[in-house]
Amino acid sequence: MMAALYPSTDLSGVSSSSLPSSPSSSSPNEVMALKDVREVKEENTLNEKLFLLACDKGDYYMVKKILEENSSGDLNINCVDVLGRNAVTITIENESLDILQLLLDYGCQKLMERIQNPEYSTTMDVAPVILAAHRNNYEILTMLLKQDVALPKPHAVGCECTLCSAKNKKDSLRHSRFRLDIYRCLASPALIMLTEEDPILRAFELSADLKELSLVEVEFWNDYEELARQCKMFAKDLLAQARNSRELEVILNHTSSDEPLDKRGLLEERMNLSRLKLAIKYNQKEFVSQSNCQQFLNTVWFGQMSGYRRKPTCKKIMTVLTVGIFWPVLSLCYLIAPKSQFGRIIHTPFMKFIIHGASYFTFLLLLNLYSLVYNEDKKNTMGPALERIDYLLILWIIGMIWSDIKRLWYEGLEDFLEESRNQLSFVMNSLYLATFALKVVAHNKFHDFADRKDWDAFHPTLVAEGLFAFANVLSYLRLFFMYTTSSILGPLQISMGQMLQDFGKFLGMFLLVLFSFTIGLTQLYDKGYTSKEQKDCVGIFCEQQSNDTFHSFIGTCFALFWYIFSLAHVAIFVTRFSYGEELQSFVGAVIVGTYNVVVVIVLTKLLVAMLHKSFQLIANHEDKEWKFARAKLWLSYFDDKCTLPPPFNIIPSPKTICYMISSLSKWVCSHTSKGKVRRQNSLKEWRNLKQKRDENYQKVMCCLVHRYLTSMRQKMQSTDQATVENLNELRQDLSKFRNEIRDLLGFRTSKYAMFYPKN
């Protein structure tokens, strides 16, 4: 009788040979018996099946008729289908409110009690606010927050408090999943907008926490990474709602209560770009590379030189060359009159970048001249005196060191060392300092003449020349960071940096393999040398190559390293071996052959694959990576801490002297009665300005939030998910319309009535 509920299947066109044979007609070896090993529930009656089917189809009158005619009580309203769903659960899933009200009227309230079924879709510790946040439902969260709901604060992964220890001991998986659910709730854009006064700052902090959690709980790495990306995209989308430069200025210059404040900059209404610096600190590449943010940065970068971008290429080149040639004159003009119109133009970040670059190119030119003016007569002097060009180089080095010291003072050690450019500058300046210090020591201690081959291997002059060579290499490599400003060379420079990081990972594996084979070959051949002359043979520099190259650890390392580049012509089989050395030669050949396979073939190809992956990763996000790196470089020129380039920055400027006198006078006046009153008025003015800025920020943030919500609603209406929801609503409306038509026509049956037993 129930067969009519399902569409019939026509098997007339199917041959009997294509159908599976019954177990009775086949041997036991040809069939496999199937048995349901799961929990077997009691079979529902016909009325119960019709009852659940009517609830699923939204047939209000069929459900009402079944409930009204259930006088004998043979209908179990708590019955469930094959999926374990009862009538109320099915009705809630289909959002049939009229049927749900009908079920509640007929005594189904007990079905609405807290469900203790382990097969339910959510765990018992998931609150409604968590589910609403998971769905990112702004309206439901608004209603729930009016009821003063609360969320448990997630503890750290390694927390050893009593509660965490008890939960871990009881069920560690459930504890980890609950922490993930809490963070999925906290990362909801709707919840962040409703509960946070500064949604952008909260998104930054939350993404950093999630990134750290992904490294600790590697089992849920993908989940935490996706949540961190969600927070980053939310901050980016919120910034994208800004419609003018004024709103961008308010957002990017906002300083939270936890950040240090620049009181002088606040009173002078200077741009500190605190929020942008914070975004770079939290590695918010999506936020920094957003179009609105980049356009605002371009405006600040060029400043009063805004017309430079619209000039032809030839005029741009002429402008850069003119500034690059006359940079000493421009520096002196700024040193004398920093507040003049000409001084303000020089203070523009773009002009500062060109002047600093020209100063550094001059320093590199002096390094080239150093090798050209080298005095051959002092070649064998053990302690040569410093030349004039040495003193010029020392001035530049002192200026660069002073610039690094100022940056270290204002940024802090942690932020200073995070920049690879600062690390390279620190190493380079340290090498130059050590070079000239050793030269001074050698000049004061040694006054003799002797051939260089007779000098001690660690003579101060020789060590100074070696350090100077390394410093020169780093000086030219420092030019790579200037490529960041170019849209063509910038992505290549970023890719090279990522490749160097991957090469460091590869180096750990390669050194282990090299050390392993070096130990084996050294132990095999350390007693095989025949004479002292052959024992002195090291590396690939032997005139008579033999396996005596492997007699020492250092020699074996050199040989195996150059073997990768086919530069170590090492004899694997000794042609002049005596009786009993065949096994030794064979074992050596096997070890070297294995090394060739592992390193030359496998590890080398692995390195190529890693470098290719790194390059492709940067290429896939080329625009984002380049704009983020360029913003980091630009920000270093936005403040007024290092306006003058080396060596002019070591000269005390009138501006610095005025600041020192002003600070000293304020300190002296602060101990007088008038000074204290003036200081109180200044603090009051500063607080009023800070409060006004905070109020403006909240107004702008409210506008951004409302625009973001409007944008999200428009996107939801154009997605497939919104289409499905609209179809469900249409289905419910049609069901209600059908029921109303039946009510008007007095028709109380449905298409399933033929299967219901009549009275």
UniProtKB/Swiss-Prot annotation:
Keywords: ANK repeat, Calcium, Calcium channel, Calcium transport, Cell membrane, Disulfide bond, Ion channel, Ion transport, Membrane, Metal-binding, Phosphoprotein, Repeat, Transmembrane, Transmembrane helix, Transport, Zinc
GO biological process per UniProt: calcium ion transmembrane transport; cellular response to hypoxia; melanin biosynthetic process; modulation of chemical synaptic transmission; positive regulation of membrane hyperpolarization; positive regulation of release of sequestered calcium ion into cytosol; regulation of cytosolic calcium ion concentration; relaxation of vascular associated smooth muscle
Membrane topology field: Multi-pass membrane protein
Pfam families named in the record: Ank_2 (PF12796), Ion_trans (PF00520), TRP_2 (PF08344)
Chain positions recorded as Zn(2+) binding sites: H155, C159, C161, C164
Subcellular location: Cell membrane
Transmembrane domains' residue ranges: 353-370, 389-405, 422-441, 463-483, 503-524, 590-610
Cytoplasmic-side segments: 1-311, 346-352, 406-421, 484-502, 611-759
Keyword Nucleus: no
Composition bias, Low complexity: 15-28
Extracellular side: 371-388, 442-462, 525-589
Reactions the enzyme catalyzes: Ca(2+)(in) = Ca(2+)(out); Na(+)(in) = Na(+)(out); Li(+)(in) = Li(+)(out); Cs(+)(in) = Cs(+)(out)
Signal peptide per UniProt: none
Sequence ranges marked intramembrane in UniProt: 312-345
Region: Disordered, residue numbers: 1-30
Keyword check for Cell membrane: yes
Family note: Belongs to the transient receptor (TC 1.A.4) family. STrpC subfamily. TRPC1 sub-subfamily.
Descriptive protein name: Short transient receptor potential channel 1
Source species of the chain: Rattus norvegicus
